[in-house]
Every structure is written in structure tokens, then in C-alpha cells.
Design a protein with these regions (language model features):
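Short, well-ordered beta-strand elements within core beta-sheets of diverse protein domains
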Residues: 28-30, 66-70, 182-189, 339-344
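Generic beta-strand/beta-sheet core signal
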Residues: 50, 92, 143, 237-239, ...
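Enzymes and membrane/adaptor proteins characterized by extended Gly/Ser/Thr/Asp/Glu-rich
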Residues: 40-75
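Amidase signature
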Residues: 1-39, 200-367
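Short, basic, glycine/proline-bearing loop/turn elements
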Residues: 61-65, 114-116, 343-353
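Extracellular/periplasmic catalytic domains that process cell-envelope and extracellular macromolecules
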Residues: 40-42, 83, 133, 228
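Conserved hydrophobic/aromatic pocket- or pore-lining residues that grip, position, or stack substrates
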Residues: 50, 82, 261
Length: 367
């Protein structure tokens, strides 16, 4: 019995990996024009795709030497939606090694430099996406975000990025880290374009992504974003400032942005959420066991019960991991060793405890 496959609807040439002046920021992983429908919401828009998201006929390296030689044989759902909406996919943007870095220095292909100042990083892990947008080489990009990987490069490089509500955008056909923290999100040079791209890629994916409910629909975000923010209530979380590892000039930049929102009509209030200081630790503890399962066994599918599994990518990863385990990034090895030790000593006790703690943490933000 043949397994279902994701559709590939639009023709494309083989493409190539650019070098030299054509890739002066190290942000391009692959160039290949794929023209979508003749009309649609994204007609005339040039889009790049983060290199942990499948585009049929193009290499998908996930920032790692381990994936060298793998060529995707399916289009991720977000890619199909972009093409159906008239967008033109220009190629793949470099991402960090296994998407597990907030910098832009870990990709096997080399560092991604910030077009604002090439001596600085773009932020990661959607590093190439931000660099190509800021350099004017594309209009939009689709990145992925588990712990800031859309938001940080957008902030560091000076473009717009959104981590959508969990499950709003289907993750189908993208390389995961852990299902509870995996998000695909739009990036663009303007808020309007970012909203327009979200409008196109959001919505239910015919049961392929089990995080979604059948009633999930996209909204006219490109219209809603033009309504302004008058009366919008925004909380500034006190525990997010002056924390260990934070920097004063960054705190001041956020405070300055908050004041500008007040001038635009928003209501900005200082709030306290004591559990915020522990939320990152709990998030890591709750996801590390699933991350081990992804990197040890499933690879480009991850534990995805009831959802779609890209079989070609899974087979390649499993064989590569057996024959070229040395190509696994150091951070992945560290996380896997940590998770193995935790399993051996404590089973899933602390992972389960962290899952239980997520509910009161969510409730604290909602109060």
C-alpha cells in the first residue's frame, strides 16, 4: 500500500548553491526560482524558505553537514500555500546547525553576517532569512521558532517576525526539534507583509498536523493590522528586565519601544509574573525528552502521532546518523547525552513534572 505524499504542484529548475559576491552575507543555501499561481494574495512577492523546511528538488541541510546529500522530494504545506497564493519562491536560506542556536555562527556552511554591519551576527536560528530580507534580496521568508528563532534574528537585523500561536501554522514538511515548541512563522520587511504572509500560511492542514483542530482558520491579518493599536493593552513583564545575562541597553531599547506604543494609542502597563523567571527552565525540561526522540530516532519527522511523516527525509536521516554520527553538531550531542543521563537516572519523572508545571505557568500569564 502506497503512503500518502505531500503535493508538488509547480515546476522548477534544478537550481544551485551561490558563492562569492552572489552570497556575500553567507545567507543563501540554495537558489532556484519556483513561480506560483498567476494571481493571488502574494502575487509579485519574492519569498525564501528556511533550510529546515522542505522544498521539492532542493537540498534541505538543516544547517548541518549530516544532511549533506539530501534533496527534499515534497513541498512543505507552507510552501504549497505560498505558491498557490501567487508567491515566487527564490530558494532556501541558511539556518543554524539543527536550528539549535540563537547566534548566526553554527551553520556547516559558515557564519551568516548581518547586512546592517557584517561584523555582527544576524541572530538565529532563522539567520539567513533575516539577512536576505534586510539585504533586499527577498520580500518575505518563512522561518521556524522554538525558543526565539524567528524573533531574535528579526530583532537583531531589523525586520519583522512573528511566532504565531502554537499550531496556527502547520508544521507539515518541516524539520522539528520538539512538537510542543515547534512553530513556523512569517518574516518580512514590513508589518503589513508579515501579516499578509501569515494570512496565507495559517489554517488547518487536513489532519496532517495533530496540533490543529478542524475548525482552525486563518484570519484577514493584513486588514486587521491596518486598524491600529488604539486601546490595545500591553503588559511589560518586570521579571524580563535586569535578569542574569540581560544587558541594560537592551532593556532600555524595549522600554523605549513601549513608550512609542503609548504615543500610538496603546495602553502599556508594568506587570509582574513571578513564574516568568523560571519559565525557560521549565520549557527546556519539558521538551528535552522529546528532542532526544527527534534526534535519536525520527529526525525530520519527530514524534508526530496521528500526523504526517516525510518518509524520504526520515530514511536519509536514519542512515546518515548511523554512518556519519560525527557530523551531528556539538550542541545536539550535548543535549542528547544530557537527556540519556536523565532517562537512565530518573526515567521521565522530571520531564513529566515539567509538563505538569506548564499549566500553572500558562495560567499565570493569562491572569
Amino acid at each position: 500500500m502506497d503512503s500518502p505524499r505531500l503535493p508538488v504542484r509547480y515546476p522548477r529548475a534544478q537550481g544551485y548553491r551561490p558563492s562569492g559576491d552572489e552570497n556575500r552575507y553567507g545567507a543563501w543555501q540554495w537558489k532556484c526560482q519556483v513561480k506560483g499561481a498567476a494571481t493571488g494574495k502574494l502575487a509579485g512577492k519574492r519569498v525564501v524558505i528556511k533550510d529546515n523546511i522542505g522544498v521539492a528538488g532542493m537540498p534541505m541541510l538543516n544547517g548541518s553537514a549530516l544532511y549533506e546529500g539530501y534533496v527534499a522530494d515534497e513541498d512543505a504545506t507552507v510552501v504549497t500555500r505560498i505558491l498557490d497564493a501567487g508567491g515566487e519562491v527564490l530558494g532556501k536560506a541558511v539556518c543554524e546547525n539543527f536550528c539549535y542556536s540563537g547566534g548566526s555562527h553554527t551553520a556547516a556552511s559558515g557564519p551568516v553576517r548581518n547586512p546592517r554591519n557584517p561584523d555582527f551576527m544576524t541572530g538565529g536560528s532563522s539567520s539567513g532569512c533575516a539577512a536576505l530580507i534586510v539585504a533586499g534580496e527577498c520580500d518575505m521568508a518563512v522561518g521556524s521558532d522554538q525558543g526565539g528563532s524567528v524573533r531574535m534574528p528579526s530583532s537583531w537585523s531589523g525586520c519583522v517576525g512573528i511566532k504565531p500561536t502554537h499550531g496556527l501554522v502547520p508544521y507539515t514538511g518541516a524539520g522539528p526539534i520538539e512538537q510542543s515548541i515547534d512553530h513556523l512563522g512569517p518574516m518580512a520587511a514590513s508589518s503589513l507583509d508579515c501579516a499578509l504572509l501569515l494570512e496565507v500560511i495559517a489554517g488547518y492542514d487536513d489532519s496532517r498536523d495533530p496540533r490543529q483542530v478542524a475548525s482552525l482558520q486563518s484570519k484577514p491579518y493584513s486588514e486587521l493590522v491596518t486598524e491600529g493599536i488604539h486601546g490595545l493593552r500591553i503588559g511589560i513583564v518586570g521579571e524580563g528586565f535586569g535578569a542574569p545575562g540581560s544587558e541594560g541597553d537592551v532593556d532600555e531599547a524595549v522600554a523605549l519601544a513601549a513608550r512609542s506604543l503609548v504615543k500610538a494609542g496603546a495602553v502599556v502597563e508594568d506587570i509582574l509574573i513571578p513564574v516568568h523567571a523560571e519559565a525557560m527552565t521549565v520549557m527546556f525540561a519539558s521538551s528535552v525528552d522529546g528532542t532526544l526522540s527527534t534526534w535519536s530516532d525520527q529526525g525530520p519527522a519527530g514524534p508526530n502521532p496521528g500526523g504526517y511523516h516525510p518518509l524520504g527525509a526520515i530514511r536519509f536521516f536514519q542512515e546518515a546518523r548511523k554512518s556519519r554520527a560525527a557530523d551531528l553538531p556539538d550542541m545536539a550531542k550535548t543535549v542528547m547525552l544530557f537527556a540519556h543521563v536523565m532517562r537512565a537516572r530518573y526515567g521521565n519523572y522530571y520531564s513529566a513534572k515539567a509538563q505538569n508545571l506548564l499549566r500553572p505557568i500558562r495560567a499565570a500569564y493569562d491572569e
